[in-house]
Amino acid sequence: MSKRVQAKHKLDRRMGQNIWGRPKSPVNRREYGPGQHGQRRKGKMSDFGTQLRAKQKLKGYYGNITEKQFRRYYAEAIRLRGDSGENLIGLLERRLDAVVYRSKFVATPFAARQFVNHGHIKVNGRRVNIPSYQVKAGDVIEVKEASRQLEIVVVASQLAERDVPDYIEVDHQKMSARVTRIPGLSEVPYPVQMEPNLVIEFYSR
């Protein structure tokens, strides 16, 4: 088992939830945390613990974004007008690797980050290899023609169980996608409940 898969399993077990909705998640078999003390009954979690858990879950879902980068998203979310929690979700869903994942060009957020890093994606006709690149409404994302027959792409395009959300229009023949709008929390197809307002509270302490 690779270190990346082990890390995913560990996060699922720590949260007690199947964060990415994976069939092979260990919480499908058991619902306690990792390690020899994982089966101990846990007491009531403090407000701080609840907020920390919400942050770890959201941060982990997007491929374990670095703490420094996640703090920048928080700072931008509270600077923007409107609900800060909704703003945070919008910023995360605007990440190029998130759009690549949502468009079903690859199977996981981790694969999406690597796919972008390796230069397989264009935005508005120009190659972009920065996973955190912020996509705008109306931008067109496409898989480079030379990359369209890679096994990782072919397999992902056949995943019937994961629908493309309404805020992205995808042409799987051309392997291109267009972001029609920036989504709110209720529109994002998370496999588990995300609580961005608790994340905002965590950083606002």
UniProtKB/Swiss-Prot annotation:
Keyword Ribosomal protein recorded: yes
SMART domains in UniProt: Ribosomal_S4 (SM01390), S4 (SM00363)
Region (Disordered) residue spans: 1-49
Gene Ontology BP term (one): ribosomal small subunit biogenesis
Pfam families xrefs: Ribosomal_S4 (PF00163), S4 (PF01479)
Domain S4 RNA-binding, residue spans: 94-155
Compositional bias (Basic residues): 1-12
UniProt cross-references to SUPFAM superfamilies, sorted A to Z: Alpha-L RNA-binding motif
Keywords: Ribonucleoprotein, Ribosomal protein, RNA-binding, rRNA-binding
Gene Ontology CC entries for this record: small ribosomal subunit
Function as written in the Swiss-Prot or TrEMBL entry: One of the primary rRNA binding proteins, it binds directly to 16S rRNA where it nucleates assembly of the body of the 30S subunit. With S5 and S12 plays an important role in translational accuracy.
NCBIfam families per record: PRK05327.1, rpsD_bact
The protein's assembly and partners: Part of the 30S ribosomal subunit. Contacts protein S5. The interaction surface between S4 and S5 is involved in control of translational fidelity.
HAMAP family xref list: Ribosomal_uS4_B
Name of protein: Small ribosomal subunit protein uS4
Organism per entry: Methylorubrum populi (strain ATCC BAA-705 / NCIMB 13946 / BJ001) (Methylobacterium populi)
Phylogenetic placement of the source organism: Bacteria, Pseudomonadati, Pseudomonadota, Alphaproteobacteria, Hyphomicrobiales
